[in-house]
Amino acid sequence: MSGPRSASPPGCAATRGGPEHRAAWGEAEARANGHPHAAGGATRGCSKKPGGAVTPQLQQQQQQQQHEQQHEQQQHEQQQHVQQQQRLAKRWRGDDDPPLGGDDPLAGGFGFSFRSRSAWQERGGDDCGRGSRRRRRGAAGGGSSRAPPAGGGGGPAAAGGAEVRPRSVELGLDERRGRGRAEPEPEAEAGAPGGDRGARDGDGPAGPGACCRALLQIFRSKKFPSDKLERLYQRYFFRLNQSSLTMLMAVLVLVCLVMLAFHAARPPLRLPHLAVLAAAVGVILVMAVLCNRAAFHQDHMGLACYALIAVVLAVQVVGLLLPQPRSASEGIWWTVFFIYTIYTLLPVRMRAAVLSGVLLSALHLAIALRANAQDRFLLKQLVSNVLIFSCTNIVGVCTHYPAEVSQRQAFQETRECIQARLHSQRENQQQERLLLSVLPRHVAMEMKADINAKQEDMMFHKIYIQKHDNVSILFADIEGFTSLASQCTAQELVMTLNELFARFDKLAAENHCLRIKILGDCYYCVSGLPEARADHAHCCVEMGMDMIEAISLVREVTGVNVNMRVGIHSGRVHCGVLGLRKWQFDVWSNDVTLANHMEAGGKAGRIHITKATLSYLNGDYEVEPGCGGERNAYLKEHSIETFLILRCTQKRKEEKAMIAKMNRQRTNSIGHNPPHWGAERPFYNHLGGNQVSKEMKRMGFEDPKDKNAQESANPEDEVDEFLGRAIDARSIDRLRSEHVRKFLLTFREPDLEKKYSKQVDDRFGAYVACASLVFLFICFVQITIVPHSVFMLSFYLTCFLLLTLVVFVSVIYSCVKLFPGPLQSLSRKIVRSKTNSTLVGVFTITLVFLSAFVNMFMCNSEDLLGCLADEHNISTSRVNACHVAASAANLSLGDEQGFCGTPWPSCNFPEYFTYSVLLSLLACSVFLQISCIGKLVLMLAIELIYVLVVEVPRVTLFDNADLLVTANAIDFNNNNGTSQCPEHATKVALKVVTPIIISVFVLALYLHAQQVESTARLDFLWKLQATEEKEEMEELQAYNRRLLHNILPKDVAAHFLARERRNDELYYQSCECVAVMFASIANFSEFYVELEANNEGVECLRVLNEIIADFDEIISEDRFRQLEKIKTIGSTYMAASGLNDSTYDKVGKTHIKALADFAMKLMDQMKYINEHSFNNFQMKIGLNIGPVVAGVIGARKPQYDIWGNTVNVASRMDSTGVPDRIQVTTDMYQVLAANTYQLECRGVVKVKGKGEMMTYFLNGGPPLS
């Protein structure tokens, strides 16, 4: 094929001299939108209910609803259309223009794009050397008209051109196609990872059974099914568990020391028992040292935990067997302490914690039963003890399960964030490779920066153009390609082109050339881009020689007489992209035009060069006169001296041999042969052998060995490996010191604290329920062991009703469907607000605490010592336990009758008030959403109030109990018949023991609360970092995807990015009925000139960019959603419709009518541009319909193309057309005429390659009804 092709500047001979080559111009984007088209318009009606007849009234209502919905849809589409017009008008309309309204003749029908009159007048022809108003326009517009410096990869500032409108419009991004994401719920809290996982309106359980299962589900935690994942989880929390274990050992040492002190304070001393307690302290201290050594491993954690449980059991047994006044209530406090700390601070699984808690409880009950079997009140004490131990175990479970679930959930969410990040990273790398295979890195990076940058609403679009001097441009055309294509099927044609251009791409990489575009059977590339090279002319000549050699192989294999015609010229180029959609990297300049004509005026199998190129070759090649002017009018007109390469000189042969030898040595040193190049090699899997050239590295290509190894890895293993490295690398101490305050445990950064405070704990209802359960246990304990009173029953009933109401309102959040809206709203306000939930939690804990000791005020508070002293007429200091036994009142622990003549009942077991207060402290620890400082303040308040009550108004209650317990333990049978009081054990007074044990509990619970909150905050911080990294990667991925979808059709990009596709899978499809349009500005070549005043033609390209941008905005309108922009070549705009199932309307042919409407809209738009820019651009448009073949060719730089007779004829309709007219074929005429479009017959037109054809002019759309 011969004739020039327009790949160079707008207005080169391509728009006129080579229309036959436009058949292969293509890069169509298949619409993947959410607007499926139905023939005849979309109708939405009400569906008929099954089983019922449709009455006429119902039919009428349905029809009315359909009409109303259609009317609303039309209004919505009209509103979108007006908004699109307003966006377009921002640049074209001036203050003196009439407003866009119903009376404006230019506002109806097609919705024009208006530009400011002053902007066009001041630019007009000046920017192309026709006046002196350009500088005024630049000053008024606030931007420079200069092109960005060569090699610049900056953002908007680097380009200097004026930015335009929001970035979604600036970069040609179709917003209506990106609305798949759901809008966030208005009441949902934002900004915190983890978010609100609670129930929402409209979701949640549907019945009471499901609601109960949902409540039970929050306390379930299972081992991960994968052993590897479970080990990662253990590693994830190993340091925290190690810290928790050390903390537990410290508090156990404290408890053992307290037990030793209590035993040492009361004679007689038993050294064996003291030795066991001291040995336990020593063992725990040794274990604490070992657990904090660097050699302590994750596998040692379980062994240390079970060893500690064994030590606790030994201490439990020894503590209960110590000589003391026997009592079934002795040892309850440390048993409760041991049980709870095993659940909360010991990092063991639930089964081990439950077994340990049950065993400790059983040991206490068994030893108490054996030692106090003769007590007639033992049953009440044992029942109370069972209730206390049961409550402790339940609270332990309620604390252990949510904590473990939270930890496992935090681990799982962190892993999911990392998994999503790595997945996004892999996809992003694929997108980067695909993107950078189409656009050079500096252009792609600048576009992505502009997407992310906030842009001002300015007059003109940014133009991505850079100027490069001293480059060589090569054009190569396959002579005889038409006969080759005629012998191939659609698949064979795609495979042949793919194989051929894959070889050319490989040769271009080896010869340091950058392939620009493939135009049908024409291939052109540039050397000296993106990085300048001194040997750019040599590279192009060598590339041409290799291409001629490669085509000879095709000739031998196929038997078809095909050959290459190569033309080369050296000079200056402008490179970049134009328009808003379907970008393709291209070059423009008069030198590119000349190179194009050098190929057209060349000879088959020869390299045709200009004198400029010859001057760069330094005599390394033998040449002969080319006489190009004899074969090409352009060369003759411009008196271009040309030459044909004969052969390279001996010097050049030696240099080439040396380079080849070095390449072989480098290949051998790598250790394997380069892979065979074939068409089936996907473009991003092939990097031209074993190495990547410097130019390709600059364009984003990686080493194939590293990439293949990366892609072959299992994604799950990759996630686990990455997480393992991150776990090993993170430092808990460093994170705490950098981000968290030491005592308050608040984040140092206010934003972090704000995000953390917005987290919603959807287990709040379970916390309230657990605290209410503690209240019930306290009630049962008090009812069992404390004398009954009306006040007791009324107070407990009141508290029960209040707590039931609180539990009811809190649990509604997890069962939203069962209750009315106001209750749901109240529950959400409580649960979703940290302040409200904290206040409700404090209220609940207060009720539980009051229920623990308020009955104390109903007990007899008389001083038993004083009564006995008066009875025996002795001083109170001489009263002992034997006086109790000798009292005439027959006092005993089991007697609830008031003594000393008072009517108030006797509460002989006041220590159970203390144990109830301990249970209320445990209820305080259940509320995980309350901060550790808040818990500390609350627990100190509880301790202070209770200790004041014990030590001041009700101290005699505890003194009396001490005396009665001692008396009850005296064995008078061993007195040998004497009247003396036998020797008996003494005990530390309860009024001394009570503050100590409560302080120990407060300390342990505070340490646990600090550990829980510290763990939660560190998990939040780590997960936040993982989430932010994931979001950054997703944001980068979104930028790449938006750019990528603006270059390749979405289905084509998805095809190449799919991991599961085969390497030998080509992309091609046959389309049954496609409408194709070519629209060219016929006289743009007259407008384009390269002068110093217009920045060597850049300002002319800026004008073309604005025109193409207007066309791109028009094709983005919703009514043209069936259309696809294929590409722009110079000043020619190519579009098609019906390329996929979502845009092809087989019955209604609406995709054909849409393309005809679009063509008329372009004509009207061009007229208006001429009116306001004082230019006289003339547009010719050609339309045709028929079958096409769509596919992707090019291994290194994929290019979506459409081929077929339909495309060829559409191109001929443009090239043979008349300025300012739309020419259509007979097939197109039949479809449009059947839809009442206004057409007129032009007559018979001679078309190259087709002979004579009857054609028609499209004058207008259907008449308005």
Swiss-Prot record:
Isoform 1 is detected in heart, and at lower levels in brain. Isoform 2 is detected in heart. Residues 139-158 have a biased composition (Gly residues). It catalyses: ATP = 3',5'-cyclic AMP + diphosphate. SMART domains: CYCc (SM00044). Disulfide bonds: none annotated. One of its GO terms (cellular component) is cilium. The modification Phosphoserine is found at S113, S168, S669, S757. PROSITE patterns: GUANYLATE_CYCLASE_1 (PS00452), GUANYLATE_CYCLASE_2 (PS50125). The chain crosses the membrane at residues 245-265, 271-291, 302-322, 328-348, 352-372, 377-397, 766-786, 792-812, 839-859, 908-928, 930-950, 988-1008. The keyword Nucleotide-binding applies. The modification Omega-N-methylarginine is found at R16. Glycans are attached at N873, N890, N976. Mg(2+) 2 binds at D477, I478, D521. Binds 2 magnesium ions per subunit. Is also active with manganese (in vitro). Belongs to the adenylyl cyclase class-4/guanylyl cyclase family. The protein contains two modules with six transmembrane helices each; both are required for catalytic activity. Isolated N-terminal or C-terminal guanylate cyclase domains have no catalytic activity, but when they are brought together, enzyme activity is restored. The active site is at the interface of the two domains. Both contribute substrate-binding residues, but the catalytic metal ions are bound exclusively via the N-terminal guanylate cyclase domain. This is Adenylate cyclase type 5. It comes from Canis lupus familiaris. The gene is ADCY5.
